[in-house]
Curated annotation (Swiss-Prot):
The gene is Kif27. CDD domains: KISc_KIF4 (cd01372). ATP binds at residues 84-91. The modification Phosphoserine is found at residues 643, 646, 672, 675, 704, 999, 1365, 1387. SUPFAM superfamilies: P-loop containing nucleoside triphosphate hydrolases. It comes from the Eukaryota. This is Kinesin-like protein KIF27. Residues 5-341 form the Kinesin motor domain. Residues 571-580, 1267-1280 have a biased composition (Basic and acidic residues). Gene3D superfamilies: Kinesin motor domain. It comes from Rattus norvegicus. One of its GO terms (cellular component) is microtubule. Signal peptide: none annotated. Interacts with STK36.
Length: 1394
């Protein structure tokens, strides 16, 4: 397959709540409808996939990972790895966190890929899949098995297999059968993974993790195709690596110390090695350079993924915050380089290996067929036991007849050869008269025998001529084969009828499903139509609501001065202007109360709004464009996690413009002058606060809606947790029920064994009593013998020894019987123990079922609660819409309220004459509040500017440090080049001196005498050696100066990294300068306004002419500023604490769910171990029961000896298999040459074989060669007599020997084809033929088939009798030939599992 570049995706996470609170700017944006990303002002990068901050997990998976899963099923290796700085969302994207406590919408890549893989497996029923899982962690450059924590790090090694793939030796691979098994292993591994808390991330990954899924797929059946070729099942093993890299860290930001600091060093070193590999592979200038895979273990593990044979996707996660600008820029640069890396994916399918597997599978089938054949023969012999002698006699007679006929044919062949030889000899050699007479008698006798054989005998039609004689055995064999094949055909017909019935049932089910699908399609269309109508209505209502909200916002922002009647000046007096009032920051995400003015209500209610559809959509598009820019400038994040709840996002997106309009234009409606004069007038206050109460009601509805949404999310988490626990409990209950069944079964076996052993105990007790009696009698006899005085001392000693032996034997027997009695009692008590354990397990199962019932009840309650919350949210949304639509109707009350205010002013104007003073007081308060707001905003801008300046100073200092280091390296490079040039000059001068000395020495050598010539020649040789060494030094120095290789490779690489770091810092400084300039320009304008306001303040305060008021006002002003600033800081801290509390609660929930999951997993593993123990106990009891408790030790010893023998056989067969695999190519090449020979014979007009039959015989050649190899290795077994007549001999020499001269011509007998063979070939063919049964005539040489003219070959008759294909017949015949040998099946002859 051709090389393809790896796919690179970039995902931008949204701003975190903490970043939003601290007003971090967004420096990374994606360009909509393109695969480009902008960082800073003008840096644009293009990638294969770009996902913005609103992207969902499903979008990332379906776009990037789903094609990789399909490639995995096809047989390719795949890899996905997440790259980026710490806290950028890598673990969240990959899905390596707490998977048990995550809702379905937020699941990462790994859970979704697992579900996709098992769905693909269920869709391929014709393929047998085996899934294995491993989970490895690279922590501090040490490998760690997360699925087997007891495995030592020293036992895990990175190696390369015979195919060049990187593997981890010693890692545990767990075979799984369902999604739940994989998720359980993933959860176990995630719980054991190293994580920690830093200042940048609460759940920071402290190691690299690699989760590998291995898929092995094998075809379930292998059948012959219609064209006669063998259809081999493919054996494919593919792997999918999910790599979660640890993020790059900076100690200044993370604040790591101690152990965390050491972890950061190791993480950064591994990522640096990975960056070097990406640079070496992705930089076209470094194509020929060495790729440093061995610098770190993570790069060694990713060798196949980067520049190897796998399909790879790299997901780069970046942070949009301006504080992470340089890290994001470096990550994007590495991702851009990675796009130049090219892999060469290869399919993990080897036809040669699969051919070997196919052959091993065929051997297995043949052995099974042989065993079934032998079983049928044994069954037939059992059913017809009375006819066995007759059948054996008939069988022996048939074998004798076949042997005699074969001998007859052999003699006949010899006679024919001798006849031809004597005919030639008669003409060539002169014989005497007596010899000629004997030869003539022999010729006449031979002719008479021929005529007698050719003449048909009366009453015997079966042997009518010479042709039928040698073929009698063939007819018998063909009849047997025909009967056997008819039985096989009948069995196949039964299978075919069953399959047809199943197919008919499936067709009927498909028809029913098609009808159901049609009905569903009709109902779906109707539902879509209704949904479309409802959506159109909702869109129209929402457009109307948005239009009204914008009108209200416009009215609130205009704030016109209204004229009112004053109390002292009559109806033409003007009311004071509305005073802007700063509202406190609300704790519920910035919702403010907005109270419109009275004139706005008049304008809104003057006429009902009527809009055309075009105007509505035009306004909607305009508002959308404005809102997009506004949202990008002032983005607000309401929760830290990525949200897949589209309804929530829509509702929040609709609320954001209104929230901001209220926060920026919040105006409190002041009371009139009369309200300041008389505060006891409740009627006027109620009328003026009518709309205020309506807005407060709207605010409370919004707060309740947010609270309900939060409750809804919590309810979803609880529901998912309960469902997960229910699934786990169901599995545990099922496993415990199976364990109870095993315990009951073990108890029953134990009871039967205990009954058996109770009888045995009584028997043993009786034997023990007898042994004791014998012992006492023997002691008495011994004492009597010692008491007697025997004259023969030798006899006495002999009798004493015999009695002592008897006593020792009796004591030993008593001890053995007592031990057996104790063992029998222990076995008898086993059933009681099993009953106790079974009762305990039943109680445990009842408890689990009770928990399941409680969970189901809780699940129903949570479902009802969720439904209620959904209804409340919808009801609140409806109420909000109604309040927004009916807001204009309340404005009709304002004229009435305004008249009431005027009446109250007119009524109160008599007693009070200081209305102007009150108005001035209101104006002063309003003015002071405005000045306070200006100063606060000014101070906030100044603080942000100071922060930006500090960040810029830090970046500049870092840049200066890098520049210093770069200048140091450049100076070193310059000094080195100067030193090299100086050395070159010195070497050149020295070379010139050496040339002069050599010339002088050569002259001296010519003129010097013979004695001095030796010394001078030695000096000349030394000078020449020095000259050559200096010449090499000068060449190396010149080469370094020419190519600029002054520094070491490490220093060159460091210089390259410094240049890149300086470039990134310059870009960050440029971005900071731009933001600082913007802030400075805004501050300049605000400073000007502030200076003008200060002059106005001074003028107004001077006009007051009261020193006390001036001092009070300044104190009040400073106090208000300090209080407001402290309040703002308090609110900021409060929100930060709330976020931390929320994060801690989420962490506690995750840990609790993980703990519960691990507890259930431990219980499950314990149950499995108990079940295995009970099965072993059953096997042990079965052995006790079968062997009656005797010979257990002997049986175990036999088993151990057998295991050792099998291990030896296994080693031998492995070696033999390797040798046969190497020698497999030779028979294939011989078969090809043999086919060419047959084709040449066919072209010559022999009529020996056609190409189709040649292909058939080539298959038989392979089987014959394999059988011969087995025989030569000394592993041949004896031939089974029951099926020896069905064997197939090898055709290697027989067919090749037959040529055009093998057929009889003009009645003469052809010479023997054995003359064409060498002596070695004859010996080998003869030995192999003797090891086989008598061959069928159709496979004999052509000379034995066509000895007379006009006789057709027997193979034509065989083809007419056969009703199956030639290939299948050949395979079955070869299977019978290869399967007759009683060779014990070993593990190597089973299909290997890789």
């Amino acid at each position: 397959m051709e090389e393809i570049p790896i796919k690179v995706a970039v995902r931008i996470r949204p701003l975190l709540c903490k970043e939003v609170l601290h007003n971090h700017q967004v420096c990374v944006r994606d360009i909509p409808k393109t695969q480009q990303i902008i960082i800073g002002r003008d840096r644009v990068f293009t990638f294969d996939f770009v996902f913005g901050k609103n992207s969902t997990q499903d979008e990332v998976y379906s776009t990037c990972i789903k094609p990789l899963v399909l490639s995995l099923i096809e047989g390719y290796n795949a890899t996905v790895f997440a790259y980026g700085q710490t806290g950028s969302g890598k673990t969240y994207t990959i899905g390596g966190g707490h998977v048990a406590s995550v809702v379905d919408g937020q699941k990462g890549i790994i859970p979704r890929a697992i579900q996709e893989i098992f769905q693909s497996i269920s869709g391929n029923p014709n393929i047998d899949f085996k899934i294995k899982v491993s989970y490895i962690e690279v922590y501090k450059e040490d490998l760690r098995d997360l699925l087997e924590l007891e495995t030592s790090m020293k036992d895990l090694h990175i190696r390369e297999d015979e195919k060049g793939n990187t593997v981890i030796v010693g890692a545990k691979e767990c075979q799984v059968d369902s999604v739940e098994d994989v998720m359980g292993l993933l959860q176990v591994g995630n719980a054991a993974r190293h994580t920690g808390t830093t200042q940048m991330n609460e759940h920071s990954s402290r190691s690299h993790a690699i989760f590998t899924i291995s898929v092995c797929q094998v075809g379930k059946s292998a059948e012959a195709t219609e064209d006669g070729e063998w259809c081999s099942h493919r054996h494919i093993v593919s792997k999918f690596h999910f790599v979660d890299l640890a993020g790059s860290e900076r100690v200044t930001k993370t604040g790591n110390t101690g152990e965390r600091f050491k972890e950061s060093i190791q993480i950064n070193s591994g990522l640096l090695a990975l960056g070097n590999v990406i640079s070496a592979l992705g930089d076209p200038r470094r194509k020929s350079s060495h790729v440093p895979y061995r610098d770190a273990k993570i790069t060694r593990l990713l060798k196949d993924s980067l520049g190897g044979s796998a399909k790879t996707v790299m997901i780069t996660c970046v942070s949009p915050s301006s504080s992470d600008f340089d890290e994001s820029l470096n990550s994007l640069k590495y991702a851009n380089r990675a796009r130049n890396i090219r892999n060469k994916p290869t399919l993990n399918f080897s036809p040669q290996a699969d051919r070997m597997d196919e052959m091993e599978f065929e051997i297995k089938l043949l052995r099974e067929a042989l065993q079934s054949h032998q079983a049928s023969i044994s069954q037939t012999s059992q059913t017809a036991s009375e006819n066995v002698p007759d059948q054996n006699r008939i069988h022996s007679l048939e074998e004798q007849i076949a042997q005699l006929q074969e001998e007859c044919l052999g003699y006949q062949d010899c006679i024919e050869q001798a006849f031809a030889f004597l005919v030639d000899l008669k003409d060539a050699v002169r014989l005497n008269q007596k010899q000629q007479h004997k030869l003539q008698q022999w010729f006449s006798r031979t002719q008479e025998v021929r005529k007698a054989v050719l003449t048909p005998l009366p009453g015997n039609q079966s042997i009518g001529n010479l042709e039928e004689g040698p073929q009698h055995v063939t007819v018998l064999q063909l009849k047997r084969e025909l009967k056997k094949y008819q039985c096989a055909l009948a069995a196949d017909q039964v299978v075919f009828t069953q399959k047809e019935l199943e197919l008919e049932e499936l067709r009927r089910q498909m028809q029913l499903m098609a009808q159901e699908s049609k009905g569903h399609a009709v109902s779906l269309k109707e539902a879509q139509k209704v949904n479309r109508l409802q959506n159109e209505k909702i869109i129209e209502q929402q457009l109307l609501v948005d239009q009204l909200s914008e009108e209200l916002a416009k009215r609130s922002s205009s704030m016109p001065t209204s004229t009112k009647e004053s109390c002292g000046d009559g109806p033409d007096a003007r009311a004071p202007e509305k005073r802007p009032h700063t509202a406190p920051f609300d704790s519920h995400w910035g919702h403010y109360v907005y109270i419109p003015s009275r004139q706005d209500f008049k304008k809104v209610c003057s006429s009902s709004p009527v809009y055309s559809l075009d105007q509505v959509f035009a306004g909607f598009r305009t508002r959308s464009q404005m809102l997009m820019g506004h949202l990008e400038d002032q983005d607000e994040v309401l929760h830290c996690q990525f949200s897949d709840n589209s309804d929530d996002e829509d509702s929040e997106g609709q609320e954001k413009p209104r929230v901001r309009s209220r926060s920026h234009s919040w105006v409190k409606k002041p009371g009139s002058v009369c309200s300041l004069v008389e505060m006891s007038d409740t009627q006027a206050e109620c009328q003026r606060s009518y709309l205020g109460n309506g807005d407060l009601k709207m605010e409370s509805l919004q707060e309740s809606q947010e609270l309900n949404l939060q409750k809804l999310r919590t309810s979803e988490l609880i529901l998912n947790k309960a469902k997960q626990k229910m699934r786990e409990l169901t599995i545990n209950i099922r496993m415990k029920e199976d364990l109870i069944k095993e315990l009951i079964k073990t108890g029953d076996n134990a009871k039967s064994v205990s009954r058996q052993y109770s009888l045995k105990v009584t028997k043993l007790e009786h034997e023990a009593e007898q042994a004791k009696v014998e012992l006492t009698e023997t002691r008495k006899q011994l004492q009597e013998l010692e008491g007697k005085d025997l004259s023969d001392v030798a006899l006495k000693v002999k009798l004493q020894k015999e009695f002592r032996k008897k006593m020792d034997a009796a004591k030993l027997r008593v001890q053995v019987l007592q031990k057996k009695q104790q063992d029998s009692k222990k076995l008898a008590s086993l059933s009681i123990q099993n009953e106790k354990r079974a009762s305990e397990l039943e109680q445990n199962v009842d408890h689990l079922k009770y928990q399941k019932v409680q969970l189901q009840r809780r699940l129903r309650e949570e479902s009802e609660k969720k439904k209620q919350l959904d209804a409340e949210v919808k009801r609140d949304q409806q109420k909000l819409k109604e309040l927004q639509l009916n807001a204009g109707q309340g404005e009709g009350l304002h004229p009435k309220a305004e008249d009431t205010d005027a009446f109250n002013l007119n009524r109160r104007k008599g007693p009070f004459r200081s209305v102007d003073q009150l108005q001035k007081l209101d104006e002063q308060r309003k003015w002071l509040d405005e000045e306070v707001e200006k100063v606060l905003s000014q101070r906030q801008e100044l603080e942000m500017l100071e922060e930006e300046l500090k960040k810029r100073e830090a970046i500049v200092s870092k840049k200066e440090a890098l520049l210093q280091e770069k200048s140091h390296l450049e100076n070193k490079k310059l000094r080195s080049s100067q030193a090299l040039s100086t050395d070159s000059l010195k070497i050149s001068a020295r070379l010139n001196l050496l040339d002069q000395e050599l010339s002088e020495k050569s002259l001296l050598l010519e003129n010097s005498p013979t004695e001095e010539k030796v010394k001078i020649s030695e000096q000349v040789q030394a000078l020449q050696r020095e000259r050559e060494q200096l010449q090499r030094q000068r060449n190396s120095v010149d080469e370094k100066l020419r190519h600029g290789r002054v520094l070491s490779p490490k220093e060159e690489h460091l210089l390259f990294q410094l240049e890149e770091g300086i470039e990134a810092l310059e870009a960050a400084i440029e971005f900071k300068n731009e933001s600082i300039q913007n802030r400075q320009s805004s501050l300049k304008s605000s400073f000007q306004n502030l200076s003008q306001s200060e002059s106005n303040v001074l003028e107004k305060l001077v006009c007051l002419n009261i020193a006390e008021i001036r001092a009070i006002l300044f104190k009040y002003f400073n106090k208000v500023i300090n209080l407001r600033e402290a309040e703002r800081k308090q609110q900021l801290q409060n929100k930060e604490m709330k976020m931390k509390v929320l994060e801690r609660d989420n962490m506690v929930h995750e840990l609790e769910s993980a703990l519960e999951y691990l507890r259930l997993q431990c219980d499950r593993r314990l149950t499995l171990q108990q079940k295995e123990h009970e099965q072993k106990m059953q096997l042990l009891l079965h052995h006790f029961k079968d062997q009656d408790g005797e010979g257990i030790i002997e049986t175990l010893n036999k088993y151990e000896d057998k295991i050792q023998q099998l291990e030896k056989d296994l080693y031998f067969y492995k070696k033999t298999s390797r040798d046969l695999k190497k020698r497999l190519k030779d028979p294939v090449q011989g078969a090809v040459q043999w086919q060419r020979t047959l084709t040449e014979h066919h072209d010559a007009g022999d009529g020996v074989l056609n190409p189709e039959e040649a292909a058939v015989l080539s298959e038989e050649l392979k089987w014959a060669s394999r059988t011969e190899n087995t025989k030569l290795n000394g592993r041949e077994k004896e031939v089974d007599n029951s099926s020896s007549s069905l064997k197939t001999p090898p055709l290697t020499q027989q067919i090749l020997e037959d040529g055009p001269d093998s057929l009889p011509v003009c009645g003469s007998l052809a010479p023997s084809s054995g003359q064409l063979q060498s002596s070695a070939d004859k010996t080998e063919a003869h030995a192999f033929t003797q090891s086989q049964s008598p061959p069928p005539p159709q496979l004999q040489p052509v000379r034995s088939i066509a000895q007379l003219q006009g006789v057709k070959p027997v193979k034509v008759c065989r083809r007419e009798l056969r009703q199956i294909s030639a290939l299948e017949l050949t395979l079955r015949r070869s299977s019978l030939g290869a399967g007759v040998r009683s060779v014990t099946a070993d593990s190597l002859e089973e299909p290997e599992e890789s």
